[in-house]
Amino acid sequence: MKVGFVGWRGMVGSVLMQRMKEENDFAHIPEAFFFTTSNVGGAAPDFGQAAKTLLDANDVAELAKMDIIVTCQGGDYTKSVFQPLRDSGWNGYWVDAASSLRMKDDAIIVLDPVNRNVIDNGLKNGVKNYIGGNCTVSLMLMALGGLFQNDLVEWATSMTYQAASGAGAKNMRELISGMGAIHAKVADELADPSSAILDIDRKVSDFLRSEDYPKANFGVPLAGSLIPWIDVDLGNGQSKEEWKGGVETNKILGRSDNPTVIDGLCVRIGSMRCHSQALTLKLKKDLPVSEIEAILAGANDWVKVIPNEKEASIHELTPAKVTGTLSVPVGRIRKLEMGGEYISAFTVGDQLLWGAAEPLRRVLRIVLGSL
């Protein structure tokens, strides 16, 4: 089996390579090849593979020699290469982090702790396109999958608190630049205990509204503020990110024909790489909270139910705690005043791990027959 990697240097690709190294995945890959869009003929990264030279990621003939292609190169690359490659007669497996092919009928959105049965059926039935899901959707399902898998959810609404990493590496840098620039504007006043906080606040507010605030990537301030819209406007009042929440969740669960209604608002906040979500769910029956917690906790090895208490919540349910880990904590689970079937939940997860790289890493192992 020849496996080709494209986009291994970018943010998601780098996290994928790091995770594959940690899990010794390259030992399960008979022949690994690395492709590039910018440095053809250069030295490939060394993961113990025989092929030491970078190949041309835009060369369809070269790509067609692969049995599996794993790409984190982005949607534009997929749009330019995928169809010509298939048209050339290539019948290999395409594993992709980008959203371009997600909703195609001949593609499966992969999140194996939640939809391993869908993936296995796809492999049996000759499906060759395995696509990583939207980060927010994947993280919600890792946390709340137990309720969805047991068909207990009548509807759900998710209000998100999404990290800068979802918009890209430059946006993460811009967030930190914004934080630093705000501090620099009032550093002297902060150092002086007698300075008035309202004066400091006014200087910060003026700076946030000024042209000097670094916002080339987000377009508006994020540090010290938030952005109540993510992705393009679909023209019906919904953003594309919000639309994905419903359609992708149902596709992952294999129930696009009989969908669970899911909707909500997606908001960008000043977190680096962890998405958080506040959810309201209407269940199909009035279950005790203890039973709900047991169903959630038993769904997979990574979800962690946090007791609905102040100290546990403020220490365990935060981006600061979760960043860089595979843990997906879920807490704030309680009955709402609307009635016994209505529950709240709050969950946090790393946007680059279960939100992006980890489902690809695992589906590659599944296709190779080693997971």
UniProtKB/Swiss-Prot annotation:
Annotated coiled-coil segments of the chain: none
Annotated catalysed reactions: L-aspartate 4-semialdehyde + phosphate + NADP(+) = 4-phospho-L-aspartate + NADPH + H(+)
Record's keyword terms, sorted: Amino-acid biosynthesis, Diaminopimelate biosynthesis, Lysine biosynthesis, Methionine biosynthesis, NADP, Oxidoreductase, Threonine biosynthesis
One GO biological process term: isoleucine biosynthetic process
Top-level taxon of origin: Bacteria
Binding sites annotated in the UniProt record for substrate: 162, 241, 268
Enzyme Commission identifier(s): 1.2.1.11
Any one GO MF annotation of this record: aspartate-semialdehyde dehydrogenase activity
SUPFAM superfamilies documented for this protein: Glyceraldehyde-3-phosphate dehydrogenase-like, C-terminal domain, NAD(P)-binding Rossmann-fold domains
InterPro entries: Asp-semialdehyde_DH_CS (IPR000319), Asp_ADH_gamma-type (IPR011534), Asp_semialdehyde_DH (IPR012080), NAD(P)-bd_dom_sf (IPR036291), Semialdehyde_DH_NAD-bd (IPR000534), Semialdhyde_DH_dimer_dom (IPR012280)
UniProt pathway annotation: Amino-acid biosynthesis; L-lysine biosynthesis via DAP pathway; (S)-tetrahydrodipicolinate from L-aspartate: step 2/4; Amino-acid biosynthesis; L-methionine biosynthesis via de novo pathway; L-homoserine from L-aspartate: step 2/3; Amino-acid biosynthesis; L-threonine biosynthesis; L-threonine from L-aspartate: step 2/5
UniProt binding sites for phosphate: 102, 244
Residues annotated for NADP(+) binding in this entry: 9-12, 37-38, 73, 165-166, 193, 351
Active site, renumbered: 135 (acyl-thioester intermediate), 275 (proton acceptor)
NCBIfam families registered for this protein in UniProt: asd_gamma, PRK06598.1
Assembly information from the UniProt record: Homodimer.
Cited function: Catalyzes the NADPH-dependent formation of L-aspartate-semialdehyde (L-ASA) by the reductive dephosphorylation of L-aspartyl-4-phosphate.
Family to which the UniProt record says this protein belongs: Belongs to the aspartate-semialdehyde dehydrogenase family.
Protein name: Aspartate-semialdehyde dehydrogenase
